[in-house]
Amino acid sequence: MSTHHGPLRVGIGGPVGSGKTALMDLLCKSMRERYDIAAITNDIYTKWDAEFLVRSGSLTPDRIAGVETGGCPHTAIREDASMNLAAVAEMRSKFPGLDLVLIESGGDNLAATFSPELADLTIYVIDVSAGDKIPSKGGPGITRSDLLVINKIDLAPYVGASLDKMDADARRMRGERPFVMTNLKTREGLERILSFIETKGGLKPKADTA
């Protein structure tokens, strides 16, 4: 479903290696039959994440765009989102019926947030392998994202992380804002993310938009 300014735009951020691109891949593959989707990735000097999505068959190549942000990927999603806004506009011109655009941030800035001008909903991905103190450290991604994803829960026993502590800290730091524990390799928790995007974003599957 398109909003007043076009498709629903979901920003996906988080540290390098947390599972952002894996989540992008799964969301595309899980939603592409029901919605008209495009994906935009941000990398500093390459288009590696976009190329990964193409190789994985997430969407057809013409629906995937890679933005090369240069040295400051944080700026490209926040202070000066013009490159990403241009990429969204190009996708809309190619696919006028777009329902959903997924936008993956680049870089490793733990404080990176999406401009409201660029993203309608934000998902922040962290992973258990970075330690169970991450949720308690706060920062805008942890406290203010619309949905927090705590990924790689299967690694907890191997890195000495307590999922109970991460759960309690996430509740304390986020208040009423939702979070999901996931193992994206096995798709555990994926349905809750899909449900969040559809419900919070007001998406209606193609079959329902007669």
Curated annotation (Swiss-Prot):
One of its GO terms (cellular component) is cytoplasm. InterPro entries: CobW/HypB/UreG_nucleotide-bd, P-loop_NTPase, UreG. GO terms for biological process: urea catabolic process. GTP binds at residues 14-21. Signal peptide: none annotated. Keywords: Chaperone, Cytoplasm, GTP-binding, Nickel insertion, Nucleotide-binding. GO terms for molecular function: GTP binding; GTPase activity; nickel cation binding. It is found in: Cytoplasm. Disulfide bonds: none annotated. Its main location: cytoplasm. Pfam families: cobW. Homodimer. UreD, UreF and UreG form a complex that acts as a GTP-hydrolysis-dependent molecular chaperone, activating the urease apoprotein by helping to assemble the nickel containing metallocenter of UreC. The UreE protein probably delivers the nickel. Belongs to the SIMIBI class G3E GTPase family. UreG subfamily. Facilitates the functional incorporation of the urease nickel metallocenter. This process requires GTP hydrolysis, probably effectuated by UreG. This is Urease accessory protein UreG. It comes from Rhodopseudomonas palustris (strain BisB5). The gene is ureG.
